[in-house]
Amino acid sequence: MKKKNMFLQLALTAALLVSTFSTTAYASDVTSTRDIPVGGSGQVEMVGTIEPTILTVTMPTFVPFNISNSLSTQNKVISPRINVKNNSNVPVQVDVAYTSVDISKLKNTTWSNTGAVTANQIAIGLKQEETPGEMPKDLSNARWLEANKQQDMNVLILNSNQEGALYVVGTLGQDVSESATFNVTPTFVVRKTSGTAN
């Protein structure tokens, strides 16, 4: 019986030592301690830090597109599908904050900020994909890029870890120079949102 009790005491002591060391390992970041007697009480101040939410969205850095009046559709742009993926665990919105436009190679051409064009105007915008894998034919719900000015325009809302797509859309007047290039460079901003994607 004595041997059995001695064995239990050793086993209990070993278990307490293991639990003490494992507790100490987890509590290594505690800066100060104090004794609380059995039957007594004491306060422990606990300070929590809320870490910033990491927002990441993957999208291309270069998108080539063609625009031509020879297309019979309202949308005169042939654009690749612009895949956008929210890699965050929270919903995000993708906004255009500013668009740099250089149409200096297009002689006698001006930019339209609204999508309505005269004979010498061009307009470019972004449109959320409505039919999977299908380029838009019309310009309804297009978000028009305003040339060389601040713009706070939402183009896409994505739920957590959701993928979505945009297309470049646009139109041009019949007198806009052909066989010339121009640059449109929108600056995208990703923000946390309380809204949800459709």
Region locations from a protein language model:
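Sec-dependent N-terminal signal peptides of Gram-positive bacterial secreted proteins and lipoproteins
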Residues: 1-27
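Short, polar/proline-rich extracytoplasmic segments that appear immediately after membrane translocation
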Residues: 25-80, 88, 174-198
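Short, exposed beta-strand/loop patches in secreted or surface proteins that constitute
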Residues: 47-49, 84, 154-159
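Generic short beta-strand segments
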Residues: 62-64, 97-102, 165-173
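Beta-strand secondary-structure signal
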Residues: 81-83, 93-95, 165-169, 183-187
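Low-complexity, intrinsically disordered segments enriched in Ser/Thr together with acidic residues
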Residues: 147-178
